């Protein structure tokens, strides 16, 4: 076989390998997307089974219609929405990287932020931590909305590892106390799961909207796929 024939054969083989690699990559991406949606659906299914579907969901008075906790001007023209799960490591990373940027923009009245806690990762703890933490966030908002941002930051600073029991209800109460919340009703709200059914209903609503992963960050309804501080500032400027 001539050298030229060998080179042609090698080139053809390399081309096939390249195509196979690209095909495998696309398949992996597709599988990952399906798994994200499936995991979210499983999370909601578990949450639904753990709630009393016949009981009316107690609705907090401090939230938006979609269950979001608004930080900043109630009438802001630019609103950043953050759909999050307190068990979600990527949510902790987002808070660490972009949380201060959002706080600064809220402080100078550039934006308001709607934090929307849902529970799609209950399966990642043995105590339905996602639901309990989301319930606690609503209890805190009802007790003292001004202290909610500090509590929110502390929750991610102390995020438990996946696969463990998660923080106990007493620990959730303690974090709220450390954030300066003194309400007498707070403890019973958290330990009694006052808003558990509401969390379940809002999680279902989020999934019905097509939200299948956390964090999902949007500016005036437009999703920011890589919500770094620079990307958020650019999206906010475009929305003004």
Place the predicted regions along the sequence by residue:
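C-terminal cap of thioredoxin/glutaredoxin-like
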Residues: 2-51, 174-240
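Ser/Thr/Pro/Gly-rich low-complexity linker/stalk segments immediately outside membranes or between
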Residues: 49-62
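A short beta-strand-turn-helix
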Residues: 61-77
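Sequence contexts marking disulfide-bonded cysteines in secreted/extracellular proteins
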Residues: 72, 89-92, 188-190
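Surface-exposed, interaction-prone regions with an acidic/low-complexity signature
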Residues: 72-73, 112, 116-117, 218
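Extracellular/periplasmic catalytic domains that process cell-envelope and extracellular macromolecules
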Residues: 74, 105-108, 209-212
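Short pre-active-site segment immediately N-terminal to redox-active cysteine/selenocysteine motifs
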Residues: 79, 84-87, 213
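Structural alpha/beta surface segment adjacent to cysteine/selenocysteine redox centers
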Residues: 86, 92-169
């Amino acid at each position: 076989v001539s050298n030229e024939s060998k080179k042609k054969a090698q080139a053809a083989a390399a081309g096939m390998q390249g195509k196979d690699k690209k095909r495998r990559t696309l398949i992996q991406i597709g599988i990952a997307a399906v798994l994200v949606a499936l995991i979210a659906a499983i999370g909601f299914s578990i949450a639904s089974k753990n709630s009393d579907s016949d009981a009316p969901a107690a609705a907090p008075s401090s939230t938006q219609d979609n269950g979001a906790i608004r930080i900043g001007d109630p009438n802001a023209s630019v609103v950043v929405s953050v759909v999050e799960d307190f068990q979600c490591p990527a949510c902790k990373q987002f808070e660490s990287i972009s949380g201060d940027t959002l706080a600064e923009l809220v402080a100078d009245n550039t934006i308001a932020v709607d934090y929307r806690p849902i529970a799609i990762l209950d399966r990642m703890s043995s105590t339905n931590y996602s639901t309990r933490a989301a319930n606690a966030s609503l209890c805190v908002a009802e007790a003292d909305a001004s202290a909610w941002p500090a509590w929110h930051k502390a929750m991610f600073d102390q995020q438990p590892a996946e696969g463990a029991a998660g923080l106990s209800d007493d620990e959730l109460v303690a974090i709220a106390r450390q954030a300066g919340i003194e309400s007498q009703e707070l403890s019973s709200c958290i330990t009694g799961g006052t808003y558990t059914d509401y969390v379940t209903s809002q999680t279902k609503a989020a999934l019905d909207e097509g939200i299948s992963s956390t964090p999902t960050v949007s500016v005036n309804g437009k999703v920011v796929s890589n919500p770094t501080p620079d990307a958020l500032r650019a999206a906010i400027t475009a929305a003004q």
